[in-house]
Design a protein with these regions (language model features):
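Extended, low-polarity segments enriched in aliphatic/aromatic residues
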Residues: 2-371
Length: 371
């Protein structure tokens, strides 16, 4: 086990105390990262539908900023690209951090020269220059399921610092990108019903061990493969230095937009963002190595997704694990490929086999029994 890869897991009754305790458990690692630059850029999660419970809580932001200042940060920039400038006030960020050396930047109103184009397999992707140039990047994400990446943890939350026009390539949405506030509840209910139908239909079709993929399903997987490639390229250029996953109140089901609240009461933090996402995935009931973006990140050397190579400080993840409701399309999403590192990383077997493949499998089984 590589003892240098530490991830803090804290379960508590109060969010602010849990975040502070998590930073205390990895204080030396945080101090090393922050003191090297003397400044930090913090990227909170802002819910594009304007819901406070689905955004980074002000206590999480405030406790994080206090920990960064105590670790040697002379200045902190809070940067987000979803919502609008008023979101910082509406969510209580400015009031909570008043008097501290903190500046706020709304990327949704940023000029063209505020973006840096990074090269990806799918073409240039515009990322906030402030984030790309930062020596210490801090990701504040929510524990939630995701309709593209299976889980919307620290690395997928980097979408918030991508240009709005390019973000659509990273997170292709099957529903309108803008929903009026008065329609959010109805849309969430409709999406839940649709999720039940999709979940049941996929489950029924895979009863015999597999099924033929339809044309739309194949095309959807191809789009998700491209999005996963983009996410890998984005993470390579803007990898968080410190990652915090807030699971006090997360989201499950039809995340990251129309899911339902999930109360875990847990905070996960560390200086290896891949390891933090892996531990958060395990707490939510997922095998980290079954999540394509985590396998790819590990293969690219961005971090460690193998739980056996991660030292947990605080609560053992197995003691705070809670099974969440997965996205309705999860049976499809787990088919997204991901290269391993040549070792024992397991790529999940397909749920969906052709009729001919199933017939061959049954024939082989009968032959084995007869022999």
């Amino acid at each position: 086990m590589d003892g240098s890869i530490k991830v803090a897991v804290v379960q508590a009754d109060r969010r602010r105390g849990a975040v502070a305790q998590a930073f205390g458990l990895i204080a030396d690692d945080v101090r090393d990262r922050v003191s090297a630059t003397g400044a930090a850029v913090v990227a909170p999660t802002l819910d594009e539908l304007g819901r406070g419970w689905a955004s980074t809580d002000r206590d999480t932001l405030s406790a994080t900023i206090d920990a960064l200042l105590a670790s040697g940060a002379g200045s902190i920039d809070v940067t987000a690209g979803r919502g609008d400038h008023a979101s910082f006030d509406r969510l209580g960020y400015r009031a909570e951090t008043s008097g501290r050396a903190v500046s706020y930047h709304d990327l949704s109103a940023a000029s063209d020269d505020a973006w840096t184009a990074i090269e990806t397999p799918g073409g240039p992707l515009r990322v906030a220059s402030r984030v790309v140039a930062a020596g210490c990047r801090v990701s504040l994400s929510i524990a939630r399921t995701h309709g593209v990446f299976r889980l919307g943890l620290g690395l997928p939350s980097l979408a918030t610092v991508v240009h709005p026009d390019d973000r659509r390539r990273l997170e292709p949405a099957p529903i309108p990108s803008v929903i009026p506030a008065r329609a959010v509840s109805a849309s969430s209910l409709l999406e839940s019903w649709r999720g039940w139908l999709v979940r049941g239909w996929l489950g029924l079709r895979s009863l015999d061990g597999g099924m033929m993929l339809t044309g739309p399903e194949r095309r959807r997987l191809e789009r998700i493969e491209r999005s996963t490639d983009l996410l890998s390229a984005l993470a390579s250029s803007a990898l968080p230095t410190i990652s915090v996953v807030d699971g006090f109140l997360g989201m499950h089901g039809e995340g990251p937009r129309l899911g339902k609240p999930l109360r875990l009461g847990t905070v996960i933090a560390g200086t290896d963002p891949v390891a933090v996402d892996a531990v958060a995935a395990a707490i939510m009931g997922f095998d980290p190595l079954d999540v394509a973006y985590l396998r790819r990140a590990q293969a690219a050397g961005l971090g460690v997704a193998d739980l056996a190579a991660i030292t947990i400080v605080g609560e053992p993840w197995s003691q705070v694990r809670r099974k969440c409701r997965r996205h309705a399309s999860d049976r499809l999403l787990r088919l997204v490929s991901g290269p391993d590192d040549g070792g024992t990383v397991a790529v999940p077997s397909p749920h969906f086999r052709s009729r001919r493949a199933r017939a061959k499998a049954r024939a082989a089984a009968r032959k084995s029994l007869e022999s």
